[in-house]
Amino acid sequence: MSNNNSKQEFVPNIQLKEDLGAFSYKVQLSPVEKGMAHILGNSIRRVLLSSLSGASIIKVNIANVLHEYSTLEDVKEDVVEIVSNLKKVAIKLDTAIDRLDLELSVNKSGVVSAGDFKTTQGVEIINKDQPIATLTNQRAFSLTATVSVGRNVGILSAIPTELERVGDIAVDADFNPIKRVAFEVFDNGDSETLEVFVKTNGTIEPLAAVTKALEYFCEQISVFVSLRVPSNGKTGDVLIDSNIDPILLKPIDDLELTVRSSNCLRAENIKYLGDLVQYSESQLMKIPNLGKKSLNEIKQILIDNNLSLGVQIDNFRELVEGK
């Protein structure tokens, strides 16, 4: 028997262990270094429940309704209940779509459900049986629902919704596709196995959800990798290599840009504010799919952070990422 005292090499593996039905799954990560599975499990759980993006109805315009406290003849639910039902509709959009209007128009009696929406290519209603309203007698019922991609801020969305037309009603959107997360740790002797229970709304695959959570968490902590404590050993004064302004280390994903703008910058490998400020307006306009509206949005974000375009920072990425 070989007496090898070198540290065991861990070859990580993530896989779907079990499909429990009703969009509930078990995802297994192994092997995990001894003592780290609980830390990893807690981190994955918190990110899954707080930080994944998704699509949600953000506003609705119902025919013959002026405000959310209205009632409709021959409709069992009031408008507040209808809006609450619309919030529960699970919508999956192609990555190229970040906002669109969905139309619903029926003339019947009985239950109006999410399956009555007219969908186009790249749009899928997951829970078609989700009730929206109940028509007690045959009548016309129509509405326009605006769907947007976003990410919750805190528990639910805090993103303002523009009400442009008479009768527009804001919906308290819940963008997060994850509904429940739990985890369990198994001891393998010299390593651990982490099993994550994930319940989604059906718009995201479980492995993709866990992978995105890990990627997002890594992005958030990566900015601290280049931090160092001064050689005098004082613990209360943490310095950043090359005295970079900390605001420049802010990840682009934290700027609450629209999905289109964020995707354009990500495709250009612009990860931090420090990357972004080094571009000029003309350089940004050359980025594929980044138009004038996105440029104005980016400029406003920079103004809000007391920054501007066209700033030169020598070797910024190398200094930040230690390359």
UniProtKB/Swiss-Prot annotation:
Statement: the UniProt record of this protein carries the keyword Cell wall biogenesis/degradation: no
Domain text: The N-terminal domain is essential for RNAP assembly and basal transcription, whereas the C-terminal domain is involved in interaction with transcriptional regulators and with upstream promoter elements.
Taxonomy, superkingdom: Bacteria
Enzyme Commission code(s) on record: 2.7.7.6
Keyword Signal found: no
Subunit note: Homodimer. The RNAP catalytic core consists of 2 alpha, 1 beta, 1 beta' and 1 omega subunit. When a sigma factor is associated with the core the holoenzyme is formed, which can initiate transcription.
Chain positions covered by the region annotation Alpha C-terminal domain (alpha-CTD): 244-323
Region Alpha N-terminal domain (alpha-NTD): start-end pairs: 1-228
SUPFAM superfamilies associated with the record: C-terminal domain of RNA polymerase alpha subunit, Insert subdomain of RNA polymerase alpha subunit, RBP11-like subunits of RNA polymerase
GO biological process, one term: DNA-templated transcription
HAMAP family the UniProt entry points to: RNApol_bact_RpoA (MF_00059)
Function noted in UniProt: DNA-dependent RNA polymerase catalyzes the transcription of DNA into RNA using the four ribonucleoside triphosphates as substrates.
Xref: InterPro entries: DNA-dir_RNA_pol_insert, DNA-dir_RNA_pol_RpoA/D/Rpb3, DNA-dir_RpoA, RBP11-like, RNAP_asu_C, RNApol_insert_sf
Name this polypeptide is given: DNA-directed RNA polymerase subunit alpha 1
UniProt record similarity statement: Belongs to the RNA polymerase alpha chain family.
Gene Ontology cellular component list: cytoplasm; DNA-directed RNA polymerase complex
